Amino acid sequence: MDYIQITKDNIEKEHICCAMSGKQSVMKKEWLKQRFAEGLVFYRSTERGKCFIEYIPAENAWVPIQADGYVYIDCLWVSGSLKGHGYANELLQQCVQDAKGQGRKGLCILSAEGRKREFLSDPKFMAYKGFAVADTSECGINLMYLPFEQDAEPPKFKACAKHPAVEQSGFVLYYTDQCPFTYYWVPRVEEAAREHGIPLKAVHITSK
């Protein structure tokens, strides 16, 4: 498989394989443009389809973790006819090489306890690749890591994510432009909440 790196120089002419609709693509690309200077890397296959990896120095990740010195994987996704050919291994190896070249402590990524959940990494695959659980939130989200040295301090969740809670009744949904699927799901979650009389506040995070 051949891969291409999306950069500030080619992002206008290249498609983002996780964002195929107009609004999804525009907002995702704008978010990426602002992150390239912070060290974000986006590799995708040259073939059409969802086969890509996106990662960034953990200090600049838009997730509530403490993982200085690590590289955080925003998304590793291979789907459809591209599954089962070892492409996820190739993309992950590219990330490992980049992280080691930068002198990083290791990699980290979010998954869920016990099973694969939508929009989170597969814990069984990550464990097979050498990742271990560094921390777990009360809502069952795991922070997994792959240290490059045995004495590397494990990353951890910040307190707000370790013990998530809101003061008001109902639910608060926080989302960013990092994942383009929020433009599909957030309105549908809001609609479902209205239909069932569930208090819901959606918060669009636009800065770290």
List PLM regions with ranges:
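Short amphipathic alpha-helix that is part of the acyltransferase structural core
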Residues: 1-48, 181, 185-189
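Conserved beta-strand in the GNAT
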Residues: 44, 48-60, 72, 77
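A conserved beta-turn-beta hairpin within the catalytic core of GNAT-like acetyltransferases
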Residues: 60-73, 83
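Conserved acetyl-CoA-binding loop-helix of GNAT-fold acetyltransferases
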Residues: 78, 84-99
